[in-house]
Regions:
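N-terminal strand-loop-strand
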Residues: 1-30, 57, 79
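The catalytic Nudix box helix
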Residues: 30-64, 79
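A generic structural signal for short hydrophobic patches within well-formed alpha-helices
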Residues: 35, 122-123
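Active-site-adjacent beta-strand/loop module that shapes the phosphate/pyrophosphate-binding cleft
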Residues: 68-103, 115-120, 133-138
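Alpha-helical transmembrane helix bundles of large polytopic membrane transport and channel proteins
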Residues: 104-108
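Short, compact, well-ordered microdomains
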Residues: 123, 127-130
């Protein structure tokens, strides 16, 4: 059975998408993660957005973009939230989801930076599979 990873495309007024820098890599990603038992896809997307970026939006702001093929063992269920000038500065965003550091075992945030990116930048910032999937969606 395929796992479902739920994520959110947070878009600003310039139609740029919010990306989180994946700690310990050169790649950026949208806030997303596996759906927990008992969660709806929307609840999962909201939780992941809060854990990975500290953003808490009302459920009514999320537009369901649907479920998409991603990997043989995983599908993506994506949502979209459009924001205005309230998010032009990303300095206050914080990741509160941690994993043990590979060498030290110290708690390490999943994301250690945030930025806005245009569609044209996705291929150079994201993993190829994610960039391809995001570019295939009309947002």
């Amino acid at each position: 059975m395929q796992q479902v990873s739920c994520g959110t495309l947070v878009l600003n007024s310039a139609r740029q998408v919010l990306l989180c820098h994946v700690t310990g890599t050169a790649s950026w990603d949208i806030p997303k993660g596996l759906q927990d038992p008992g969660e709806t896809p929307l609840q999962s997307a909201q939780r992941e957005l809060f854990e990975e970026a500290g953003l808490d939006f009302d459920a009514g702001l999320f537009e369901d973009l649907g479920e998409f093929a991603y990997r043989p063992d995983k599908r993506l269920h994506l949502f979209k939230v459009e924001v205005g000038e309230e998010l032009c500065n990303l300095d206050h965003l914080r990741c509160t989801s941690f994993f043990p550091h590979q060498r030290t075992g110290e708690p390490t945030p999943e994301a250690d930076g945030f930025r806005w990116a245009s569609r044209e930048e996705l291929s150079s910032l994201c993993w190829p599979r994610m960039a391809s999937r995001l570019l295939s969606i009309d947002w």
